[in-house]
Amino acid sequence: MEYRSLNSYMKERFGCKVYKLAINGGFTCPNRDGTIDSRGCIFCSGYGSGDFAEDASLSVTKQIELGKKRVESKMPSGGNGAKSTGKYIAFFQAFTNTYAPVERLRELFTEAIKHPDVVVLSIATRPDCLGEDVLELLSELNEIKPVWVELGLQTIHEKSAEYIRRGYPLKVYEEAVVNLRKRGIEVITHVILGLPGETKEDMLETVRYVGGAIKLPYENAGKDTCSNAGVKESKGENGMYRVQGIKLQLLHVIEGTDLAKDYREGKFECLELDEYVELVRKCIEALPRDMVIHRMTGDGAKKTLVAPLWSADKKRVLNALNNTNEQGGKML
C-alpha cells in the first residue's frame, strides 16, 4: 500500500523537514455565535479544535516564536551542539479562521506569511465562510507564499451532517472547493471516521468522494491551475476539480460536548484500534496515489478525552498504522 505522506510531500517541495505551528487568531464560529446555531458541532470542544494552539491574546509573531521554541527543544543537536532547524507551517486552527472582517484577516494572515521561517499559511475554516472578499485576499496571499485552506467536511451523508450540526449542505462544500481551486489555492479536506450511525462503507464512500473530482459548472468557475511551484495540476477531465490533501480523523469523544452525553447514554460505540487501523488502510487504498495524507489519526487532549481511551496513546496508534502500511507496501 503506497501513500503520499505530508512529511514526504514537504521534503519534496521544500527540501527540508517542515513543522506545523498552531496559531490562535481569536476567532469564533457561526455555529456558536447564533448565526447558524449556538451549540457548535456536536463533537467540538470549547477550544474549537484548537486545544494545542497558543494564547489568542499574543501577537501572531509571538505565537510563532513560542511554537518554534517548543519544536526546537525537541530537535536533535548537530555535531557542533547547535540545534538543527527546519521551516514552518503557520496553521490558523481554532474555530472558523475566515469568520471576521477581511481587514482583520489581512492583518493576521499577512503577519504570519511574512515571517521568514514560515513557508506555508494554512487556514482551517468552514466552506460557508469564504465570501468573495475573503477569496480575493487568500488569492493575493497565495502569490506571496503557498496558502492552504482546510475544510471540515467530515461526511457526505446528510443524516450524519445533521446529527453533528455541521450547518451547511454538501453543495456549499463543492462550491468552496471550486472557488479555491480556480485561484490555485490548495485544499485539504477533513473527514471523521467513526461517526455514530455510519457503517464502514458509509465512511469509505465519503473518502472516495473526497478523492474524486467535483464537476462543473459552478458560477464563475475557471481553469483549475496552481500558481505555486511543486503543486501538480489538479484539474480532471471535463472541467472537474480535485482537492490536494485529506485529514483522516478518528472520532474523539470529548468531555463537555453533547457527543459525550450521547456516548454515556449508550447511543453509539467507538471504533476499536484494530478496526480503525483496517479502516484507515482501506481509506488509503481508495484514494489517488498523488493525494497527500495529512493525518491518519488525530490528537485529543488527554485530560478531556472520554473515548476511545486507546487513542490517547498516539505512539501506539501510529505504530499500529505504520506496521500495517509497511506490511502492505511503502510510503511515497
What feature does the model see in each segment?
Residues D51-L58, A94-E107, L121-R183, L193-I214, ...:
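Conserved non-cysteine loop/helix-boundary elements of the Radical SAM core domain that shape
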Residues S73-T85, K215-Y241:
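Intrinsically disordered, low-complexity terminal tails and inter-domain linkers enriched
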